[in-house]
Amino acid sequence: CVFDVSARTVATQSLNIFGDHSDVMACRQTGFAMLVESSVQEVMDLSPVAHLAAIEGKVPFLNFFDGFRTSHEYQKIEKWDYADLKEMCNMKAVEEFRAKALNPEHPKMRGSHENGDVFFQHREACNSVYDALPAVVEKYMAKINEKLGTNYDLFNYYGAPDADRVMIAMGSVCDVADEVIDYLNAKGEKVGIIKVRLYRPWVSSALLKVLPATAKKVAVLDRTKEPGSLGEPLYLDVAATLREAGKNDVILTGGRYGLGSKDTPPSSIFALFKELEKDQPKERFTLGITDDVTGLSLPEVKPAPITAAAGTKECKFW
């Protein structure tokens, strides 16, 4: 099965139904694969990957994108032709899926009880399925790329090939970061972003493949908060990846942003890269707010440079 989810806030000190990643991050241990998009066009392009990979890979998918910021955005996009999608569909896998579906004509028992003598072994038996899933996702991303002329991958890098400062994020903030990165690189700086596409299963080798060898400082952005944790989910995944790869010389920082649909404008991304210029940047930080309690916030760069393309007109409706 595939759940297409507009990621939203889990209410805490007050009710908030707006956009962040706190709900989907609460699903990490369910065993669902997790695919994420950062724009309306990407939702159109990559949602079929979740459905096609779920059928062939035999793993349920949680396909998510930012609530409101992406889910409610009006945008001109290129739509799929159903004939193209049909060409990519593995009908043999569909037939196997249907054959295994619950049916009173050929009943099967699911969810039987197991004691401690065998439960652990059976729980580990699914490892091979999850180990094989990234290759299935890559296969369908390659098919999408062939049809659309795109370059989707498990992780995509954007920016200077010899960047010394890199941010890692997922969701709609990536589009904002692209504009800031273009602006800074045009000024002679060397920065970039790694965009997460397949969040679960996590593939360390795919992340390391796109991380510039020149990267000295890496900032990971999470759109959720786990009180009491050493760091937020994406940060911890990246930290483990760098540690296991022996990249102990890379300075790693982690920050929170955009909780409850808090805006993350270019000024926040400028603040992030400015902080990374320091010899010892903050290990933990927040973007887009003024934290006068614990002092974690980074000062916004204001007035922020204009990063929009020349001739762009901006309008506000209310």
Task: Place the predicted regions along the sequence by residue.
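Terminal amphipathic helices with adjacent charged low-complexity linkers/tails
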Residues: D66-P104, K209-G246, T253
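Conformationally flexible catalytic loops at phosphate/diphosphate-handling active centers
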Residues: F61-N156
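Peripheral docking tails and interdomain loops at the edges
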Residues: K217-A308
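Short acidic, glycine/serine/threonine-rich loops at helix termini
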Residues: T12-F18, D45-V49, H72-K79, D178-V180, ...
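Redox- and metal-dependent alpha/beta enzyme cores, enriched for Fe-S-associated oxidoreductases
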Residues: P161-E189, W202-K209
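Glycine-/acidic-rich phosphate or pyrophosphate-binding loops and their flanking alpha/beta elements
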Residues: A142-R165, D178, L298-E314
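Conserved thiamine diphosphate
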Residues: L15-G67, M91, E244-G260
